[in-house]
């Protein structure tokens, strides 16, 4: 993904309400097991949330039945 090369995005995962992966990139491809935990995160009224991981931040956005997780550096 070209945007990843020009930003601090380390990877992404897009998944549906059943935990099926729609697309993954970068470290997201190696963190598919995160889907179970990420799908339980409480989102705000607009469908956003942020989760601090070990060395990564995970930015979540859900619209309809699709959730997008964007992994960035936790710096």
UniProtKB/Swiss-Prot annotation:
One of its GO terms (cellular component) is Ragulator complex. Disruption phenotype: Sensitive to high hydrostatic pressure (mechanical stress). This is Protein EGO2. It comes from Saccharomyces cerevisiae (strain ATCC 204508 / S288c). GO terms for biological process: microautophagy; positive regulation of TOR signaling; protein localization to vacuole; TORC1 signaling. It holds the Pfam family YNR034W-A-like. SUPFAM superfamilies: YNR034W-A-like.
